[in-house]
Amino acid sequence: MNLLPLTFLFPLVGFLLLSFSRGRWSENLSALVGVGSVGLSALSAAWAIFSFHSSPPEGGAYSLVLWQWMAAGDFSTNFTLYLDGLSVTMLGVVTGVGFLIHLFASWYMRGETGYSRFFAYTNLFIASMLFLVLGDNLLFLYFGWEGVGLCSYLLIGFYYSNRNNGNAALKAFIVTRVGDVFMAFGLFILFQQFGTLNIQELLVLAPQKFPEGNLWLTLATLALLGGAVGKSAQLPLQTWLADAMAGPTPVSALIHAATMVTAGVYLIARCHGLFTLAPDILELVGIVGAVTLVLAGFAALVQTDIKRILACSTMSQIGYMFLALGVGAWDAAIFHLMTHAFFKALLFLASGAVIVACHHEQNIFKMGGLWKKLPLAYASFVVGGAALAALPFLTAGFYSKDEILWEAFASGHRELLIAGLVGAFLTSIYTFRLIFVAFHGEPKTEAHAGHGISHWLPLSVLIVLSTFVGALITPPLAGVLPESVGHAGGEAKHSLELASGAIAIAGILLAGLLFLGQRRFVSALAKSAPGRFFGTWWYHAWGFDWLYDKLFVKPYLLLCQLLGRDPIDRTLGVVPFSVRGGHNLLSLTENGRLRWYAASLVGGAAILLGALLLA
């Protein structure tokens, strides 16, 4: 376990070396440092995970105090690494999937300006996420939280010479900062009430000090939920994620699969004891997830950009995780987080291969017929898409998503179950719409398959993990998270499995019926009045950007214009202006004429005499 600090120190050192190189290193050397540092981190993590399983720590968790960070009066905080079943799972996902993404990126980014800078940012991204999941208190978690936010800004705006990319990065930074402010308020409340931010101490003290439904706990968990929805792109702070596709495709894979958007799920799961004492907020978590997964599913139906389709699918899949957390299916949420990392990384990396092969074309309707020219990318999309659609029994996504649906049913949340089934149907339609349109039909562009081990190896490994093989990896969460109500199954569970599987297959068949062949019905529907109305609405993500522009952006810009005219200084400027005006008037009396002075004396005396007589 003494190797545990190396998991985040290796990528941190990689970031420093690449930063100090200032782009003077060759691409091979930059790739060696950038990929190698994450590879060493993954090896360190593998050893830590092996040690955790082979020699289980007493109490099911291992703590390693590195140093005392701060001490002031009665307050002190140590920088301590905490490893239990939950952080072991996250450690494996972040370093394992992160390494595969870095390896693929070494191929994808060849020839790009800022090759070293790219790997410097991604190394810092991995280090920040590991800082987040290994810290034993919410303060250090928050530092990692802000670190991944900063890295997302840098990577989304990587092609900063394009103004739209800079705007997308700024939008992501601002929207997620809104959630971060809420989270900071939550930390203030918790520290004020308990005098500590150590997570394990909070989980012990909370039920001792407060009854279920306590106002302070409700406010604190609501604030933490605000932070989680911002970072995990859930309603109402989901608008940044689709625009985040402006960055390089491996960045999208990192954000969606291995790092940033899973942070909100991890936060709620890690603070599970606080949320169970605030049942109204826990219920709200499930509702937020259910609404998000349905709205994102409809939005994905009409997107034409291959990466934006996958971005909408990420919002939807994270919605399933929030739904699971909301019904108390803690294990199922983390299980789906893990399997989602496998197939979503696969889909994004495969989309990167397609984009490079098609000369950076991202519109799926300008592709077509790619299955013969890009067999590995096609296989990746078929397997990853099947896992995303939860094709029964063969894919990892089926087992994790089915567990969520069963827990929703077993806990009596029938409305959330219906939302999950609707989302499953939409997912299978939009996923295979992408596959049928991009890979089948008439070719519309020239495409050339990529080569090299850094291209095919990550895709091949993720293909295997996206099948049922990935579902065999069970997160060691026993004793870490509360046992869910639907832990045991039976006839009802098997029936639900068959129903959800049938829904997924029905969606795939419907997608084939609509998008293989002439697509006349789809074209006619899109041109109809209802089709244009809903298509525009869904394409623009239900109009949230328009609404926020009217409610927040335009009033803010108007306020900036008003303040730019300096109204305060102008108002205060009336005083010196009046004094100067009075002085100028009085100075007119100093004209050097004796008659004027005599008249002034007589006039002044008359005024004084009149005042005395009137008094």
What are these regions (language model features)?
Residues 86, 92, 96, 100-141, ...:
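Hydrophobic transmembrane alpha-helices and their helix-loop junctions in integral membrane proteins
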Residues 448-510:
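Hard-cation-handling environments
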Residues 1-9, 25-32, 75-93, 131-144, ...:
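Membrane-entry segments of alpha-helical transmembrane domains in multi-pass membrane proteins
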Residues 390-396, 401, 469-480, 604-615:
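Juxtamembrane "helix exit" motif at the C-terminal ends of alpha-helical transmembrane segments
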Residues 38-47, 99, 187, 294, ...:
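Hydrophobic core of alpha-helical transmembrane segments in multi-pass integral membrane proteins
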Residues 36-53, 179-189, 382-389, 458-473, ...:
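Hydrophobic alpha-helical membrane-insertion segments
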Residues 2-5, 21-120, 193-214, 239, ...:
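Transmembrane helix-loop-helix hairpins at membrane boundaries of multipass inner-membrane proteins
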Residues 74, 82, 480-495, 520-615:
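Aromatic-capped, Gly/Pro-kinked transmembrane alpha-helices
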